[in-house]
């Protein structure tokens, strides 16, 4: 996974089912993108860890637009795997 994969990711949205607050998710995605960009440049400063991503919590939404939880959770699993690979190097 590369930083541009994170930057380009678009999550599905939900209004009637519980979702995740978009701002919370977007803030985490920006930290992940910055971390991956740092690894790509071999100069990651203050990287977010796989453990931090795995334990991230988001404000729930309901009856207003939020990101689809399954979309976000599936992508977070991919991010955790990618970060673990970088951390093992």
Give the ranges of each region predicted by the language model:
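Acidic, negatively charged sequence signal
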Residues: 1-89
